[in-house]
């Protein structure tokens, strides 16, 4: 029987564990304390967890022993907040074995380094295991998946072999895993879309309507593609499941934590108050700060990101920021804003179109 270790008793970690265990694979969920492990094992569910009729499936178990959790595992899934990735993978690193896949299921960028989670993992594990690193990302709202609704995701790695191996471990009847070898693009799509989800929440909170929100999402996707390409991603990845797919799901659903934060900001609540009231992390808040600094350092114009940054960190009024963004001076939709990557989509005429033979 295949075994998967999940580090992170987060909603997303438990959701992934549930999907994998329902397929008949052994899942060991690592809890940081004996008390947490004992409580989860006894109740077979987290407290205040939705849906209310949810319980751990038969093959999902909990332990406070990291050695036990990792022993014999084919893959370790890191389902922790992005700012906690480094200390957690550092704990696991000495216990990893040569053939064990190490998969990030976190969607964020590290504050201070601007590194993607696969880069953080690579920093902390032996170089001998670097070919085993992969990431999971896509339009994956945890509550829908826990209800058994169909969903798809993307497993990305530097090689198709590693991506396929990881995809096979997580694929289930209602959870299909596609593969991709653009690990940079898949990670950035999942991380940067949270910024736009904050903006979509602001638009919804202000009742700006679908026209304005669709414009925001579309311009946001352009910014994601621009920054992503500048960082080495394939721009086409952002038109796929880990880009556009994840963006649509997160920007249009009330289940999204980042969308929730955006809505609450329009009610006059402070960011600290909103974050303190939440049981889970809204990754877009920290990712906005990282992306804003990246854009400045690379001389990229990202007005959507900049305006959301000002709302979060400079106390800008959400309504004024949104109106300012919508009233921005129009220019060519795809070019003219230092986004040289879009030149690659322009068709070059190397010869005249041949004339048709009238005969």
Swiss-Prot record:
It is an enzyme of class 1 (oxidoreductase). PROSITE patterns: NAD_G3PDH. Keywords: Cytoplasm, Lipid biosynthesis, Lipid metabolism, NAD, NADP, Nucleotide-binding, Oxidoreductase, Phospholipid biosynthesis, Phospholipid metabolism. The keyword Transferase does not apply. Its EC number is 1.1.1.94. NADPH binds at residues 11-12, 32, 107, 142, 257, 281, 283. The active site is at 193 (proton acceptor). The keyword NADP applies. SUPFAM superfamilies: 6-phosphogluconate dehydrogenase C-terminal domain-like, NAD(P)-binding Rossmann-fold domains. Catalyzes the reduction of the glycolytic intermediate dihydroxyacetone phosphate (DHAP) to sn-glycerol 3-phosphate (G3P), the key precursor for phospholipid synthesis. Belongs to the NAD-dependent glycerol-3-phosphate dehydrogenase family. This is Glycerol-3-phosphate dehydrogenase [NAD(P)+]. It comes from Dehalococcoides mccartyi (strain ATCC BAA-2266 / KCTC 15142 / 195) (Dehalococcoides ethenogenes (strain 195)).
């Amino acid at each position: 029987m295949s075994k998967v270790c999940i580090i992170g008793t987060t909603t997303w970690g438990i959701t992934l564990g549930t999907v994998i265990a329902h397929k008949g694979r052994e899942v060991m969920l690592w809890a940081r304390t004996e008390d947490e492990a004992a409580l989860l094992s006894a109740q077979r569910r987290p407290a205040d967890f939705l849906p209310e009729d949810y319980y751990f499936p038969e093959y999902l178990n909990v332990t406070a022993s990291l050695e036990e959790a990792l022993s014999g595992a084919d893959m370790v899934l890191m389902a922790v907040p992005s700012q906690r990735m480094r200390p957690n993978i550092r704990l696991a690193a000495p216990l990893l074995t040569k053939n064990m896949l190490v998969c990030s299921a976190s969607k964020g960028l590290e504050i201070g380094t601007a590194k993607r989670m696969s880069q953080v993992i690579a920093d902390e594990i032996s170089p001998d295991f670097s070919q085993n690193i992969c990431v999971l990302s896509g339009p994956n709202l945890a509550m829908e998946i826990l209800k058994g609704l169909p969903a798809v995701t993307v497993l990305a790695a530097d090689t198709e072999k590693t991506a396929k191996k990881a995809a096979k471990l997580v694929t289930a009847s209602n959870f299909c895993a596609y593969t991709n070898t653009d690990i940079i693009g898949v990670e950035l799509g999942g991380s940067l879309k949270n910024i736009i989800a904050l903006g979509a929440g602001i638009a919804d909170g202000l009742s700006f309507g679908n026209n304005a929100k669709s414009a925001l999402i579309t311009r946001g996707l352009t910014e994601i593609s621009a920054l992503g390409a500048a960082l080495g991603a394939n721009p086409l990845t952002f038109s796929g499941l880990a880009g556009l797919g994840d963006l649509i799901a997160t920007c249009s659903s009330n289940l999204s934590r980042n969308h929730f934060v955006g809505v609450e900001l329009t009610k006059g609540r402070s960011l600290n108050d909103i974050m303190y009231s939440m049981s889970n992390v809204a990754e877009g808040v920290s990712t906005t700060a990282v992306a804003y600094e990246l854009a400045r350092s690379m001389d990229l114009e990202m007005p959507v990101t900049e305006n959301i940054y000002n709302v979060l960190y400079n106390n800008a009024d959400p309504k004024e920021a949104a109106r300012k963004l919508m009233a921005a001076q129009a220019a060519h939709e795809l070019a003219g804003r230092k986004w040289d990557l879009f030149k690659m989509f322009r068709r070059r005429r190397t010869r005249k179109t041949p004339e048709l033979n009238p005969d």
